[in-house]
């Protein structure tokens, strides 16, 4: 399994951290982006960012030797064609359906016939992405949480056509990364799978409380932390998920 090569398409807040996590778990990983600046930023974050190897070494989370080995397994590329030669390709581009559909169309043309195509979408239909390919049995959702280096969350989204082999492979990779994979069904008529549907219901109600003058957003955050032992409140979650908890 660790001889498997994995490609990550998109070097943003999520893509860079996911690539770092996969390389740390022992996989040869290529992080791809059309922007050289995005690739440089991602590499800098992997090396010296808040969740990067330098700080992880300082905190005793990883040895210098293991961090060096992970960096040796991690590469950055502007070539989607090169990245698509991997055994698994995980799409992590911005949450725009038109962009994700285009990426899956391009991956279908570039990837080998046995390559599993996964998406880190927060809620778009995996069936719609699979429809851009000739391999719907090898298309699957793998939704990560921010920051991906830390969070154990792994929402594995399957369609009626996703093969058991693809599901098992992604589950095994997720577990080897220290994640807790939970398989859920694609719901093409709704956005958000499980985690985000429940999350946004909470956010809507929290915003109603503020709009009605019942409490401030700061007080809502603190009450939820105190009552439910959350690390942060709902409004703080929005900011953290957006900026990668930097």
Model-identified regions with their sequence ranges:
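NAD(P)+-binding Rossmann beta1-loop-alpha1 motif at the extreme N-terminus of oxidoreductases
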Residues: 1-55, 110
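A short structural micro-motif
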Residues: 73-77, 226-231
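Rossmann-like dinucleotide-binding cores of NAD(P)H-dependent redox enzymes
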Residues: 34-48, 52-67, 156-166, 192-199
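Internal alpha-helical scaffold of NAD(P)-dependent oxidoreductase catalytic cores
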Residues: 25-27, 135, 156-187, 202-230
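Rossmann-fold dinucleotide-binding core
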Residues: 116-186, 193-196
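Rossmann-like NAD(P)-binding element
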Residues: 34-37, 41, 52-117, 124
